[in-house]
Amino acid sequence: LIGTAMLLAAKEQVPAKFSGFQVTSQENEKKLEFNNQGFELRQIEMNGEIFVKPEMSNADAVVNPGQPYLPTISTYYAVEPGKSYSVSLTILDDETVTEVDIMPFETWDSEKTGLVTKGDEYLLNEFFPSELATVSDPIIMRGLSMVQVSLTPFQYNPQTKELMIIHSAEMELVESGT
């Protein structure tokens, strides 16, 4: 229901806000504005270590086991059929939290072991993920051509233990071919 309302808002250019996303498109533009609706940095003890796990409502994770667990939020956007898109992200407001040890993602299996292992990303002195915003290939749902636009409003450097939190951003869908 929320996805359908977001689609209609995109198609009819009616201001609508869902999970922090708001359509701000003008003619010949495909823009979404993101405003962080809140999050919690929960402390969790695993393997005798204290980790921080960022949590947001209506968010999923788009990570593999061993990678830093960072929530990702998504929405659908109606697009012209037969076109493909990329996304351009402009961060409008962010903050950096220091001395944070983000919990590694354990597993996609339904049965958890309670043991987490830090993957190779924890050895790198760079922010993860490298791409904060993504757009899917177009899909057809109920006769509408749509793309899924996803944003990870967190970025983590495991070596410096810095967590960047995005409070607001603008995303523009850019036509990248047919």
Predicted regions and their residues:
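Extracellular pro-sequences of secreted precursors
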Residues: 3-178
